Amino acid sequence: QFGNNKAYCQDNIISWLDWTRKEKHKDVFEFFKYMIAFRKRFHIITDSRGKATCSYPPVSIHSNVAWSAKYYDDTRMIGVMYAGVSLKQQGLDEFVYFGVNAYWDYVNVELPDLPEGYHWKLYVNTGNEPQDVILEDRNVILYDRRINMAGRSVIVAVGERY
């Protein structure tokens, strides 16, 4: 690769970025720009500092049932929760949940319970229309920790203090 950003052994149209088409595909560009910024804001995704003060593990795997990592032939989704001590607010924890529905139809998903004083806020839902994928500013709170994920979609939720 010699320092370039191309996919391994794919120096062809599969891995080329045609920046002249950025305006045509502005929604995709804005989505990935948002996700890169999101990753930089939440250090627990890439830089675990150990268990959260609430004793949740740094990374936990979930099926459509929270805290269950049992997978069967008909399991349709996977959830990953990151938990850790906040570097921004001393004494507080951060929680980030990624859910991926690989099935073609809707799947009911239960997110993990959070410590007292936290609730899940939906930041991203790719099952929505393109203009409604990024939800951070819309205050979509999952009070009952459940969401009906659209087929072949991804959600990102953040545990926030209330």
Regions found by a protein language model. Give the residues of each.
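Carbohydrate-interacting/catalytic domains
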Residues: 1-162
